[in-house]
From Swiss-Prot:
GO terms for biological process: rRNA 5'-end processing. This is Putative pre-16S rRNA nuclease. The lineage of its organism: Bacteria, Bacillati, Bacillota, Clostridia, Thermoanaerobacterales. It is found in: Cytoplasm. Could be a nuclease involved in processing of the 5'-end of pre-16S rRNA. It comes from the Bacteria. Keywords: Cytoplasm, Hydrolase, Nuclease, Ribosome biogenesis. GO terms for cellular component: cytosol. GO terms for molecular function: nuclease activity.
């Protein structure tokens, strides 16, 4: 079974997918947001194409663990996602994943600012999903 990771933002949704063994996450695409209906159609295509059995959605929290405005938006998105799909959907603490993704792209990949904007959400989705996959190995 493959697992999908989502980094949900106001303008884009970063998408990552696991390998069949649930060990490694890789970036798949970035969905440009338009409406929940269209976003969900694209997510459904990916679920069907990759035979996804679970979705991990990054939940942005403040450093003190509370939910800010973006976290509340993601919670609403996930409520609709659960209504649209009958597979397990898990919220995963994504604190600092976007910061880490930016650091990786600057320090390790030496990618320009314009190019970073294109891939940052996809990389954040990879980090969210990989953190989840790693946590499951230890169980």
């Amino acid at each position: 079974m493959r697992i999908m990771g989502l980094d949900v933002g106001d303008k884009t949704i970063g998408v990552a997918i696991s390998d069949l063994s649930g060990t490694i996450a890789q970036g798949l695409t970035t969905i440009k947001r338009s409406s929940n209906k269209k976003d969900f159609e694209r997510i459904k295509q990916i679920i069907n194409e990759y035979e996804v059995g679970m979705i991990i959605v990054g939940l942005p929290k403040n450093m003190n663990g509370t939910l800010g405005p973006q976290g509340q938006k993601v919670m609403r998105f996930v409520e609709h996602l659960k209504e649209a799909f009958s597979i397990p959907i898990i919220l995963w603490d994504e604190r600092l994943t976007t910061v880490e993704a930016q650091r990786v792209l600057i320090e390790k990949a030496d990618i320009s600012r314009a190019k970073r904007k294109e891939v940052i959400d996809k990389l954040a989705a990879v980090l969210i999903l990989q953190n989840y996959l790693d946590s499951q190995k230890n169980k």
